[in-house]
Amino acid sequence: MTRINVKIKAGQETELNGAGPNIPESAMQQLETQLDALNENDILILAGSIPGSLPQDTYEHLLARLQGKGVRAVVDATRDLLVNVLQYHPFLVKPNNHELGEIVGKTLQTDEEIVAAARTLQQKGARNVLVSMAGDGALLVDEQGQVHRIGCPKGKVVNSVGAG
C-alpha cells in the first residue's frame, strides 16, 4: 500500500499529494487484532490523515477499543481528527501552532496565547500538548501544568518536507 506525493521546490513549496491507499476491511480487522495485544504503558501513535476508504472516526474507534488498557496514545492529526479523540484522554497530542489556532478559532501570536490554547485541549482531555512552531521551536504543556519551551538550531532551510 503506497501513494505518491510530489514536492516542488521553486521559490515556494508546492505539495501534490496522491490519494491514500484503499484499506480493505480485512486489513482493519487485522490491525484491531494487533492493537488488542497492546498492554499498559505500550505506546500507540496515530498520525496524519485517514485514508478515504476508512471512516473519518477511525482514530476514535481505535482509541475507544483501547480504553481502560493503559495504552499511551500519541495523536498528531489536524482539526476534527484531533479534537474528536480528546474524550479518550490521549497521553500526548501534537498540533502545530497554526492547527492549534484553527482548533480554538483564533490566530496565536504569542507564547502566552499558545499556552492558553494548549490548556484548552487539556481541559477537553489531552494529558500533554506539544505544539511545534516551525523555526520558533516547540512548546510543551505537560500534565502537571508545567510549560517547557525549546528553540531550534538556526540555519538555512534547504527543504522543509518531513520537518513537521
Question: Could you tell me what each predicted segment is?
Answer:
Residues 1, 20-22, 79, 97-100, ...:
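Short, acidic/turn-prone active-site loops that include or flank metal/cofactor-
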Residues 43-114:
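Conserved beta-alpha-beta core of the PfkB/ribokinase-like small-molecule kinase fold
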Residues 64-65, 111-163:
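Conserved phosphate-binding/catalytic region of the ribokinase-like
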